[in-house]
């Protein structure tokens, strides 16, 4: 959520900043509604003052044994007006809140301005793209002999986009997750296994709704709707909603492992088959609550952790500074870490690390008290540390051998009983 006071003060400047993300944004209706709401509040306060004055006159009239009927009628008329004003005010405030809730975060000044991902800027490349002496296979082809994934059986139970891991695929997945969690703990992150279902107001607080309403799996629990989380960012942000933190306790670094659920699997087309785009996947999420002064330090820390992971896994990767047209709704700046997938002949995002400023904390009402006792909204940051499906794809495709076997990265071997290679089933 943006600060309405800044929009009132600098409407043209705010509109121009928002149009960098979405050129169709106009603040005209919002400003008109805001003006109406403030006028209604002022009129209501005037009526309340008038009613109070009349009530005083009624009391005096009764003490003096005078006829107070006209005064009482005046008070009753004001009461009727106030009821009408209150109804109109509630309606106008709801409309204003909805408009405010649909405005994205302002992009930082150093973010490239572009309508889409074509404006993304590669800021770092690391590692060599592998060259093979044989035609490299897509991970779905590799799996035909490895048999560590199953796409057909879960399609029976759940539909397309819901793969299952099996055999050594399970062990490799858990090796990855254990390695990732250990890495987060080593860097001072508090580990969490949080709930997977959240209330609607928690989705609102993280910025998922109302902008993307209808894109999440929903469960009806009596009179309350609960939503399966698309990312642990949602629940970690919600942990401190409507709280006042102490400045000396900041920054707070959290890391959570969760399954994540998204309805848009398959949106990338048939070429993104297999694990590249799915409805359910595992992810370790990093999240931080900071002061504005701590924000950049936390941001670089998160980026550094992601780079350390990809370097230790010896995967070729690049860092991309996302343009305004490719950034998320809540982010003011995002850097994507992208790994090379030989099966796609392209780099694919495995982590997005974003600064959100006070955008989420205004929605969640998460503040901190400084040494002088003054209250401020916290800054929030989030980043994948990492999502495993594409990471697993990257390992299978980059470490594949001509015979269809896959070498296990050295960093993961301690978590797989020092196993060094995945062999095709026919070779076992």
From Swiss-Prot:
EC number(s) given by UniProt: 6.1.1.11
CDD domains: SerRS_core
One Gene Ontology molecular-function label: serine-tRNA ligase activity
Ligand binding (L-serine): 231-233, 285, 384
Pfam families in the cross-refs: Seryl_tRNA_N (PF02403), tRNA-synt_2b (PF00587)
PROSITE patterns recorded: AA_TRNA_LIGASE_II
Catalysed reaction, written as an equation: tRNA(Ser) + L-serine + ATP = L-seryl-tRNA(Ser) + AMP + diphosphate + H(+); tRNA(Sec) + L-serine + ATP = L-seryl-tRNA(Sec) + AMP + diphosphate + H(+)
GO cellular component, one term: cytoplasm
Keyword Nucleotidyltransferase: no
A Gene Ontology biological process term: seryl-tRNA aminoacylation
Domain notes: Consists of two distinct domains, a catalytic core and a N-terminal extension that is involved in tRNA binding.
Subunit structure: Homodimer. The tRNA molecule binds across the dimer.
NCBIfam families referenced in this protein's UniProt entry, alphabetically: serS (TIGR00414)
Protein name: Serine--tRNA ligase
Organism: Chlamydia muridarum (strain MoPn / Nigg)
